[in-house]
């Protein structure tokens, strides 16, 4: 896997913002060819809710495309590139760490489904293979938030950017 320390990823994003650059290059991996974003194809119970998910890492998007292709054994592996123009009119939520707020946010979206927030864009860590066991133990009530955060502390995770504004 092509994983970075999440703080490295966020530092990269913050540097771009600090430089006054209002654009970010994002990638989306899929096994389906498309010309328009169709959120009816989005899965319901995802980390940041129903949305269109991208990443700043092209290799991560390529891995997403490969997993989808292997899971469905249909289509091809596609990696789409987008330019995201940040705007002050967008309500953007940044998660900077695998912390209690991130855990609770993911729990609400995964358990309740749909969109459990009012943000247009959410940026933060992915609950993936490295973190899923701890996240599941927290969601089931076996671990307290503080225990889960301590276990997640040393994990390296990928990033995700979820857009809900197409809904």
Can you name each region flagged by the protein language model?
Residues 1-24, 46-47, 62-63, 67-167:
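Conserved NAD+-utilizing ADP-ribose enzyme module
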Residues 19-46:
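Short aromatic-glycine-(Arg/Gly/Cys) micro-motifs in beta-strand/loop hairpins
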Residues 36, 61-62:
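Short, well-ordered alpha-helical microsegments
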